[in-house]
Structure formats: structure tokens, C-alpha cells
Amino acid sequence: MIPVSGFEGRTVAVFGLARTGLAAARALVAGGAKVALWDDKPAAREAAQAEGFELTDLTRADWREFAAVMLSPGVPLTHPAPHWTVERAREAGAEIVGDIELFARTVNAAPEHKRPKIVAITGTNGKSTTTALIGHICAEAGRDVRIGGNIGYGVLGLEDMHGGAVYVLELSSYQLDLTSSLHADVTVILNISPDHLERHGTMDEYVAAKRRILLNQGKGDTAVIGVDDPWGQRICTEITAANRRTIVPVSASKAMSRGVYALDGLLYDATGERAQEVADLKRARSLPGRHNWQNAAAAYAAARGLGISGEEAAQHLMTFPGLAHRMETVAVLGKVRFVNDSKATNADAARQAMSSYPKFYWIAGGLPKTGGIDGLIDLFPRIEKAYLVGEAAPAFADVLRGKAPAVESGTIEAAVRQAYADARAAGQEAIVLLSPACASFDQFADFEERGEAFRAAVQKLADGQADAA
């Protein structure tokens, strides 16, 4: 772990005792701080106690005793309303921080020879794939790399730092809201589209949270900016005018005179005097579709920012094994391929997967996001049939009515069973695509659990076929 410095002998309240909170609590104690731990959920409190932590009921505590309050990323700061912990901290004058801020301060306080390189990645979609891809390139290039953050590994639980290490961190807008001291050697903003507006209030506030990743960069640092959306293009233009760092625009939709871009699956490096083709991404089996070409362009540019040669970065792109729940083929039964894209928690992410197939049987729904699936109407002709689950099912059925066949399946298991029956009956090669365009929290703990439910339902079909054989 990374012992947190700066709070020796003082008490830090930690609210939220899932992976991030517990990793932070361990790191604070290792650094000499005292901790006051609490969570609204009894199961989370029990897990902390099972690990040997004492609990402090923060609803009854004197908050003036806390040097800082460490909040887990899911705790709302402003919208739809400030969480009670936020109000109590502000009343007591206690500083509110997140685990990334604790990490950043610890790095900044370390001697120069011990400070690692930091790559920080954000964006609306593609963060996890790009984070894992950069980590893969670094590892294959012989770097001592540690991957963490929003990808599922609390940063403070990673191995302690040294001057030769590279930390590759996926950062959500929630985490960036609580971060002000991070200085990343390489930053990546992949793309920006409307998401999490129930948490940020407005699109301007959401974009502002994403831009926080650029704080504290200066001469010698690199910013990789996706310019295929208007928000990214605007950020790129504005920071180019500031002229403080190396800026590398990336695109998967257009050729550029400067930057890194992918056209028809071919990756070009235009950071030198002329554009050079460096990779044929269509040969990278784990990076299908234009959205993954953007991820690859960003990862390549980030690796170059770390001093890895273009030839080596391109070579290691091709051996990336992929990530679970991101356009992951989980099984092929006869002529039917089952694709798990459970990570598609909004319509824009679902668009990436839907655009990759000419026809598909679509499993969608869950806890709806603002805007629903209205923005996907141009892709409805590709839908052989839709199988709708969760809270969004009735609303999605209304949107699809008259445009694509749809049925309200209710559960993932029922949807898989129905989709397979229809695809099998058609007698042709077919895709059954789970790309929900929704959050998962109405039926599952997270998108991973939803993806595993899909995998289990497909396995049940496979087992049934084996028994019948």
C-alpha cells in the first residue's frame, strides 16, 4: 500500500467503506493517522469490523475533531443535494478530500528521487479500456506499472511508490471533484458527452469536473485530448492557446495535420513532420470498432508521452487481451455469438457497440439515464429485436414502438433465453448484444455483477445444450 503522509497523529474521518474507503483507511493508519470510519450500510460496517477496524458513528461525532473528511466517490457534493456528511464537514470547517487527493499529496511530499510517473485518464466512455491498454503497453515495455483508480483498484492500496514506477489511473468525474493537488505527467481526456448530470447538475459542471485532470500540469508534461466531440475540441483549443505543455489531439473520425488519429482502422502518428501509419488496428482482435480505435490512439499517444518509442507502443497495442464487460465475446453457441458490453451504462457508450454490428438482438435497460435511448434512433434499423429489462423497460418499449420489435423481458436471464431462441430460429449467424444504455443499480450492485449475470445465463444455455447432446 501507499502510506498517506501529512496527517500523522491527527484524525481523518472516512465515510464509505467499500474498496476505496477501506484502502484509504489502511493507508492513513499506515501513515500514522487515526481514522474514524462509518458507512450508512450495515454490511459495509460489518466488513470493516471484520478487518479489525473500530467504527465511529459519524452521525453523533464531534466533527471539529477531524483534520479532514475522506469521502468515497459516490457521495454527492452538490446534486441532487449535498450528502449529510458534506453538510457536517462544512459546518465544522473540516476539509473534504478523496483518495486521489490523498495520493497526490503523498506523492508531492515525497523526495524528488522517489516520485513516480503518473498517467491520469478520464472521459465519458472508454476510460477503463484505455487505462488497461496504457498499463499493458507500459508493462510490455518493461516499466514497473501499477493500475488503479476507478478501474476497480483503490489507488492507495497499490504498491508503494519509487522513482521508476508508473501509476496509470482511471479517474471519474466524481473522483476529480475531490481532487486539486494531482500533478499528472500525462493526462488523457478521451471524450465527453452528457452523463451523470443528476450528480453534477449541468453539462458545464460535468465538463469542469473532467477538466480538473489538467490542473497543475506544466512544461514537460503531456495532455492527450480526444477531439471528436465539441467539448473535447474546445478544451484542446483553449489549452493549446495557453501553450504550457505538449498537447496531442487524438481522433478516430478524421485525419489531422498534428496529433494521433485512426482512419478505417489504420493508426497514424502525425506528431512529427508528416503522418506515418504505425498500426493496423483491424488486426487487434480485442479492439473492435471505432470507439476502440480512439482508445488505441489515446493509449499510443500517452505511451509516447512517457518516452516509449512509437514502434514499441504500436507493437504492444496489438497484443492487448481486452477487458471483461467491454464488447467481450462470452460464448458462441452454434451460429449465435453472445457479446457482453455491460459497461455501456449510457446511450453514447451503447452506440459504440451497436455501431459495430450491422444487425443484432439487443438486450437493454436498467436504471435509465437522462435522455434515455432517444439519441440512438438512427441505429434502430439494425435491431432484429430488443429485449428490455429493469426500470427502463416500459419507457424504452415506448421509444422503440413502430421502429423495432421489442419485448419487456424483465430480467437478464429471461432476455438471454428469449434472444437466443429468436436468433437460433432465424438460422443465420447472429449477435446477441448486452449493451444496456443504463446504469445497473436497479437490479445489480454494479455493471460487473450485471455482466456476470449475462455470462451465467449464457452458460446455463450452453449447459442445457450439452445435457441434451
UniProtKB/Swiss-Prot annotation:
Task: Write out the GO MF terms.
Answer: ATP binding; UDP-N-acetylmuramoylalanine-D-glutamate ligase activity
This protein's UniProt keywords: ATP-binding, Cell cycle, Cell division, Cell shape, Cell wall biogenesis/degradation, Cytoplasm, Ligase, Nucleotide-binding, Peptidoglycan synthesis
Q: Does the entry feature the keyword Cell wall biogenesis/degradation, yes or no?
A: yes
EC number(s): the record gives: 6.3.2.9
CC per GO annotation: cytoplasm
One Gene Ontology biological process: cell wall organization
- Give the InterPro entries listed for this entry: Mur-like_cat_sf, Mur_ligase_C, Mur_ligase_C_dom_sf, Mur_ligase_cen, MurD
Binding-site residues, ATP = 123-129
Q: Do the record's keywords include Cell wall biogenesis/degradation?
A: yes
Subcellular localization is given as: Cytoplasm
The reactions it catalyses are:
UDP-N-acetyl-alpha-D-muramoyl-L-alanine + D-glutamate + ATP = UDP-N-acetyl-alpha-D-muramoyl-L-alanyl-D-glutamate + ADP + phosphate + H(+)
Q: What class of enzyme is it?
A: ligase
- Pathway assignment: Cell wall biogenesis; peptidoglycan biosynthesis
Using the chain's own numbering, where are the disulfide bonds?
Answer: none
The residue range of the signal peptide is none
HAMAP family attached to this UniProt entry: MurD
* Family of the protein in this entry: Belongs to the MurCDEF family.
Summary of the function given for this chain in its UniProt record: Cell wall formation. Catalyzes the addition of glutamate to the nucleotide precursor UDP-N-acetylmuramoyl-L-alanine (UMA).
Q: What is this protein called?
A: UDP-N-acetylmuramoylalanine--D-glutamate ligase
